[in-house]
Amino acid sequence: WSYPSIDFNNDYLFDTSHAHHARDCAIIYQISGEPRFAQKTASFLREWSAPDGYRRLPRAGNQELVHDGEFFKSAACAYDLIYDWDGWTEKDRENIEQTMRFYMEYIDAEICSGEASNWLLAEIAGAVYSAAVLGDKERMERFLYGPGGAADELAKGVLDDGWWYEASIGYNLMCAGLMSELSVAASHFGMNFKDIKVTPAYRRTNCVAEARLDGLSNDIWGENEKNYRSIEMLWDSLIPFYDYRGVVMGINDSAEQKSNAQTKAFYKLDYELAYRLYKKPEYAYMISRLGDDERNVLFGEEVRPAYELDELPYEKSCYAQNAGSVVLRSHKKDRPIREQIQVGLKYGSHGGAHGHYDRASMNGLMRYGRSLTNPENIWYCYHTFMYKFYCQTSINHNMVTIDLKQQEAAPPKQLLFYAGDAMQAFGVENNSRWSYPPYGGWPVGKQKTIEERQWIEGRSFPIPENHPEYAVRSGFTEPVITRRVTVLTDDYVVNFDYAKSSQPEAIHDFQCIYHLQGLTKVDDALSIECHTAQLSDDPLSSAQFITDCDWYETKNEVNKDSQAVNGIKDRVAVKFQFHTEYAEKKNNFWRYDWKWQNRTAYNEYGTLDTDLYFVPMKQDDSMQFAVACPPEFALVNKRLYWKVCAVMEKDKASGEQEVVLAEGKFGAWILGKETVDVALDGVKKLYLKVFTEDGRQGDLYEYESLKTIFWGNPVIETKNKKKLDMSEFVYVCENTDEGCGVGKDYEGGRVTIQAEEFDKAIPAEPKDKKKWGVITLDLEGLNAARFHAVIGGDYPVGDESGKRRTVFQQQTGNSACFASVIEPHEGDAMIQSVQYAGSWSIKVTLADGREQIVSVKGIENMEESDPTKNNAQTKSSVRVLIEEFQNGTLIRSEETAR
């Protein structure tokens, strides 16, 4: 470990990670006794605590105040571990104490807001650790038990079901771990914080500020049945949701995680710490899910603790009624656990800033130790406009949307939960308005307008003249009820969806959306009706970022002699097939690095095939579908400057003087392009110039971008109207990477600029980013009249076959009904066919000859959803029936309770 000296031009001292490395260095000193490790740690602490260090700014790390809390916690640990080292001076200790007290005073004021958040808890932890290392018990008690302190956070932040109110796996683990670490620190001063039970706040919001125009909700939904909150509740709440490998599905701002995953490099907040404090067998079980290289060397037992449990948590379905996380698990008898199916659903409290607008969505699907989808598959970091303008929006999830808009956060209604033998089922209702997402996401950094934000990130998109205010939603619909009933059988998942407007005259487009990876086949019954560069060219919509869209339609083709069921004859489902590969650095990326196009981890190596069926549920004579390319993250964003320059014929005698014919600049990424059309009268030489700067991945990160810049199909138009491809001429490249040649991107794929393919594109990425890249073309003898081209960035880069695809069925009207079936398998599919079998019924024919009829009843019963009636305690009429036949004989039947 080495760290740079403070750069006084920055508004922070160090990268936050250096404080954690200082703590680790101090641990090594304790283990080895070698003074050099103490000296190294002390050197860092001296710079941090000097008068011109933290107290000058005050900002210790390069991130947010929450991370300064982590910084101070690690710095306090480091100081404590080398406290008795004989190299300290009196001035050193004075500076450290003054710095810690300065921070504590700062945080004392910060936590009096009355809110609960992971930020405040981390900031409190830094203050408690600072007070502890100074031996100041009074300050420890203030931050543990005082107003806004850790006990207050426990009362306000923990939901009745034990989840942290932000309902995100990482923040659940973070808060459970921080509370537990505070307990360890408090125990050294005779305080028993680990067993504290506090009275809940019982409030229905976790924010005292006014409602935000961007749609963020801090409201808490669901029941309050407990009269206490405890640290153990945080640890206990997640255990039922972990699978047999110790991996949990993501929800809101989280992907799949193991119990030891949260900020693993910095601090170990996992079930080994929980077991040290509470010795519960459930925690010992969680430790058994960890590999040897995943053990906690700070808090773990030398030998894995033994445990006895009557039932293993991963064997049954479960849900959390406040957080709204659901996991349904198949349990076919005598089937290996890795072959069972898990499906995750989301329906509960929004989760504040980390909440996604995806109530009634399928937010996870796992089989064979592999994940098909999670809420963060497409992820841009917090400090980008895409975070709120796309990542959290409804169309980025597996759900039904209205007009491709964003669902408003509103309290859901649970319709049913059933855990049986033949099936598992869950039903939920959402009743809310839909709108455009907050325009431009939300303001981050110092940029005051979306134009400024676009430029600093290097990500352009069209900005209309009369757009909404920055970060404000617009274009609201009336309330629309959406209902989803998910049924999990031994072999597949069924999603029944019903949506209906609250206004009888309102007409909407309803989309039943899935995002799956590696599309290999589209049903032969479909034919392409058209292709559009974007799913929508509406500049207010997040659908503009989904590109390369094929629109399909199918006509009913029925046998004349076939018998109609509810007016629908022989309606066979439309099928889409997918193939996904998993390897060490393929669909396992983010455990190594977050900067990857598909944020998923802990997947077993191998392949997973998935069949997706859409069952016709209406009498319409056609079904409409779309297949498009969602905006998977890639390091393609850059600030692009371009010029078309010329040397004129008239300047031959006086020397070659360049004239700028056209120029521009924009952010080139998934979108962003400019069309060039310039006159060439009197031009002797043409110069195409490009200069780039890497765009920011938010305010905190800047990485070298991929090579993407091309001149799209440049053409010389002659005076007699002939169009000559520039790629056919000899041109000279200076400081320009020619890549794979004309018409190929820098990884050998096709060149697409804003979803338009250019088969004669000329590479233009500068080799040295500090200089302009120049392409020179001699026009003498060409009788040139005009130059035409497109300039922009290629996306996606390289092979596209494994990319995630957005697939949806669309219906138009006042209401919509969908039925979709998903079977993940390893190449030996059980489903032979799926078809319509009557109102809200489907028939699934299996490879062994069995036929299963899956039906949902009461899904269209809107009386119990009538807002004019008191239906809070009304029992839902929704129920599910599965019937199984062999050779026409009923062999099994199961129905959920009415």
Kindly label every feature range from the protein language model:
Residues 75, 714, 820:
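A residue-level signal for conserved active-site and pocket-lining positions in enzyme catalytic cores
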Residues 535-539, 652-797, 801:
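Gly-Asp-aromatic-enriched flexible segments
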Residues 9-231:
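Aromatic-lined, polymer-binding surfaces characteristic
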Residues 167, 171-656, 798-898:
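Extended polysaccharide-engagement surfaces of secreted carbohydrate-active enzymes
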Residues 1-6:
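Low-complexity, Ser/Thr/Pro/Gly-enriched N-terminal "stalk/linker" regions
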Residues 33-35, 417-424, 488-491, 680-684, ...:
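A short, structured loop/turn motif at beta-sheet edges
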